[in-house]
Swiss-Prot record:
It is an enzyme of class 3 (hydrolase). Zn(2+) binds at H84, C110, C113. Gene3D superfamilies: Cytidine Deaminase, domain 2. The keyword Metal-binding applies. It holds the Pfam family dCMP_cyt_deam_1. Residues 14-146 form the CMP/dCMP-type deaminase domain. GO terms for biological process: cytidine deamination; nucleoside salvage; nucleotide biosynthetic process; pyrimidine nucleotide metabolic process. Catalyzes the deamination of dCMP to dUMP, providing the nucleoside monophosphate substrate for the thymidylate synthase/TYMS. Also, part of a nucleotide salvage pathway that eliminates epigenetically modified 5-hydroxymethyl-dCMP (hmdCMP) in a two-step process entailing deamination to cytotoxic 5-hydroxymethyl-dUMP (hmdUMP), followed by its hydrolysis into 5-hydroxymethyluracil (hmU) and 2-deoxy-D-ribose 5-phosphate (deoxyribosephosphate). Catalyzes the first step in that pathway, the deamination of 5-hydroxymethyl-dCMP (hmdCMP). The gene is DCTD. This is Deoxycytidylate deaminase.
Amino acid sequence: MSEVSCKKRDDYLEWPEYFMAVAFLSAQRSKDPNSQVGACIVNSENKIVGIGYNGMPNGCSDDQLPWRRTAKNKLDTKYPYVCHAELNAIMNKNSTDVKGCSMYVALFPCNECAKLIIQAGIKEVIFMSDKYHDSDEATAARLLFDMAGVTFRKFIPKCSKIVIDFDSINSRPSQKLQ
């Protein structure tokens, strides 16, 4: 009888990497040509309770609304129309509420999303990028989070890439239970 390894593999994804990867994978659904942002809401039991990405509102054609960042008229840009990933994750929640949950998000939230996060009862925001740190919107978001007691921190990944290889399921040798 051959001996099957009893030791677990040590290269598995830990929870934080898994949740941030889900946020990044969700971002791939965004049709925005400039910014693809995803968000993943997790409860205290490490269960995903909401996922979202930036996109146009339900029922509004993303072929008819603008995706540009700049124009003479603000109505000809995406900004008055697009729903941010944080909003969509909260609206897509699969539980009665998200009070006390954590949100993993690719980009530090703007002030409008900060208000939604606070009102939803989310207590922690883990973000990957803070590239708009000095903007008024990010400054206001930090102030609101501090006042409401929402903690926020930059995500420090243990690896720089997570590869999804659909062919890998067929390349691993199968093990038969004996």
